[in-house]
């Protein structure tokens, strides 16, 4: 039986043949991947249902459809994106032509998370394959059913010398084993804690990395917003996957003049979307495991509870829960919630909210609800985050035309669409000098040449 190291070495040998660099070959593989995905859709839905209790609708919209978008965009644009990109040549280097040549890195390691185990593993794989790399995939051990169907799909499309699915059952042990190997690029999605471990391991070989992490993404609700619409969109964004979304609105800063009315709208909207008992709704998902269930449950402070708070320990479900009068000293504000809790903080002055947001780690996303164009521009220009959505939640992540990634503690590197293709490509600068002219001023001896050079290069 081959060891992991031997399999990775096989990938390296296969990459050196140059087959993955052929653009038509890449396109055909992506088309085949799309065809297999379509034939296996129901199995994907079943796996996500078992792992996270996601409905087929949620699974399609937030996982499968986004993967199709990425595949289609790459198939359509690979030839254009792969062309050498001509750039200007400085006058002092004439006669010459300059261009940027995009080339694949080689063997890429992709470590996927549990919360969107299909999409957040497949999306980076698509960019990696489109750019001409081989890939080693390590899905999350916390989503075992999705990992199984991923393995089935990948084996129908790729030989393991091209794309290798690593069984995640050994969890931390297999990650440690992988990180001892030398890769040409590492793409990790998960917590900041593990992200630091990945980055430290990558530094041993000076391997470039992309870290898609998370953090506490703020949601600011100003008094001039469309209140009912804001509540509807916030409930949708917060409760997708039971709050286990890296860009979920983590906490809500609500203007004090509308706080009570907003909480009522929030309660109404939870009932509209999931009924009077969300724990019985077929559209309401669960925490991924008992550990996460207990962690999120510990954040519910009964003294600040105004709505929800019930749970089902057998199914690992926690009701949508609203907490009022929350402060930064409360446990729920110590780290990313990653669960269906709405902590409400009130504010009077937008500048103060911006100051408080900026005093924390830079978030993966920021949301602002307002109809005031000047205040919208102020929030965008005065804060730093991986991405921003105005008057909605999450939707910026679904666009293949926008870069998605973190900043600071929420991650590094951006992908989706062309940004994925560029991410997994080394940008090689090339200058092709002509031979019919050779100015000797650059060669020694340099006596009496400085004055002339200063006139040219100023």
How would you describe each model-predicted region?
Residues 4, 23, 41, 171, ...:
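Residues at or immediately preceding the N-termini of alpha-helices
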Residues 26, 71, 132, 164, ...:
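Residue-level signal for inorganic ion chemistry
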Residues 15, 19, 34-37, 41, ...:
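Structural signal for hydrophobic packing residues in well-ordered secondary-structure cores
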Residues 158, 193-327, 390:
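ALDH superfamily catalytic-core signature
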Residues 91-229:
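Rossmann-like NAD(P) dinucleotide-binding subdomain of oxidoreductase/dehydrogenase enzymes
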Residues 1-99:
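N-terminal Rossmann-like NAD(P)+-binding subdomain of aldehyde/semialdehyde dehydrogenases
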């Amino acid at each position: 039986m081959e060891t992991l190291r031997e399999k990775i070495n096989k990938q390296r040998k296969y990459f050196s043949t140059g087959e993955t660099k052929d653009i038509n070959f890449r396109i055909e593989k992506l088309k085949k991947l799309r065809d297999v995905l379509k034939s296996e859709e129901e199995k994907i839905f079943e796996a996500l249902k078992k792992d996270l209790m996601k409905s087929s609708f949620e699974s399609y919209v937030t996982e499968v459809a986004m993967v199709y978008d990425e595949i289609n965009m790459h198939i359509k644009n690979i030839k254009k994106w792969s062309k050498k990109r001509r750039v200007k040549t400085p006058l002092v280097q004439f006669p010459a032509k300059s261009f940027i040549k995009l080339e694949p890195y080689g063997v890429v390691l992709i470590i996927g998370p549990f919360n969107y185990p299909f999409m957040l593993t497949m999306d980076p794989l698509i960019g990696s394959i489109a750019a001409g790399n081989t890939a080693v995939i390590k899905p999350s051990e916390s989503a075992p059913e999705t990992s199984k169907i991923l393995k089935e799909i990948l084996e129908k499309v790729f030989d393991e010398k091209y794309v290798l699915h690593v069984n995640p059952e050994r969890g931390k042990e297999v990650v440690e084993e992988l990180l001892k190997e030398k890769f040409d690029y590492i793409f990790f999605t998960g917590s900041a804690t593990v992200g630091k471990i990945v980055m430290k391991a990558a530094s041993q070989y000076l391997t470039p990395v992309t870290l898609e992490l998370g953090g506490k993404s703020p949601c600011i609700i100003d008094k001039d917003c469309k209140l009912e619409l804001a509540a509807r969109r916030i409930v949708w964004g917060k409760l997708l996957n039971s709050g286990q979304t890296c860009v979920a609105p983590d906490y809500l800063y609500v203007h004090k003049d509308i706080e009570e009315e907003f909480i009522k709208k929030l309660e109404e909207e939870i009932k509209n979307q999931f009924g009077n008992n969300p724990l019985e709704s077929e559209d309401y998902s669960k925490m991924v495991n008992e550990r996460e269930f207990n962690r999120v449950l510990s954040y519910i402070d009964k003294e600040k509870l105004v709505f929800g708070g019930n749970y089902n320990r057998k199914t690992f479900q926690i009701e949508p829960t609203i907490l009022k009068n929350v402060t930064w000293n409360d446990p729920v504000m110590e780290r990313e919630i990653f669960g269906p809790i709405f902590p409400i903080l009130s504010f009077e002055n937008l500048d103060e909210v911006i100051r408080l947001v900026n005093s924390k780690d830079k978030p993966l996303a920021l949301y602002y609800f307002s109809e005031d164009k000047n205040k919208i521009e102020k929030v965008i220009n005065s804060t730093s985050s991986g991405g921003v959505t105005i008057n909605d939640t999450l939707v910026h992540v679904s666009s293949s035309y926008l870069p998605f990634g973190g900043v600071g503690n929420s991650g590094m590197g951006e992908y989706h669409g062309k940004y994925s293709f560029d991410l997994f490509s080394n940008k090689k600068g090339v200058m092709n000098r002509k031979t019919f002219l050779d100015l000797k001023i650059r060669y020694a001896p340099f006596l009496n040449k400085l004055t002339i050079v200063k006139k040219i290069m100023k």
